[in-house]
């Protein structure tokens, strides 16, 4: 998934020269937002150069939720949609009110 799809998207969308830089997956994990457990995640930055969020749940699987950036931009992506951004941008996982929202998260470092 990463080397065939996500890596090339990072190179293209952020104008990173693949001949001069390498992408290193610092961490990858699944986050489960559940109305009975972790409902949200407060504003934070990630400890890497780039962050990728791949939505695993369909919008019909939960109510509420989404990713919101400090500037007010809110994205409620559907299953298979991907959000890529600088890890230095403050963002949060908005509260879900029912159901389960799952996302696959990658923390990426750009190495010269």
Regions found by a protein language model. Name each.
Residues 1-82, 88-112:
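Fe(II)/2-oxoglutarate oxygenase catalytic core
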């Amino acid at each position: 998934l990463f080397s065939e799809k996500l890596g090339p998207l990072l190179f293209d969308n952020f104008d990173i020269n693949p001949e001069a830089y390498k992408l290193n997956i610092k961490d990858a994990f699944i986050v489960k937002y559940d109305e009975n457990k972790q409902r949200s995640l407060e504003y934070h930055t990630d400890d890497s150069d780039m962050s990728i969020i791949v939505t695993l749940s369909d919008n019909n699987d939960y109510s509420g939720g989404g990713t919101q950036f400090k500037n007010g931009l809110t994205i409620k992506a559907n299953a298979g949609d991907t959000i890529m951004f600088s890890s230095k941008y403050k963002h949060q996982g908005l509260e879900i009110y029912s159901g389960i929202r799952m996302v696959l998260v990658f923390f990426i470092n750009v190495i010269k």
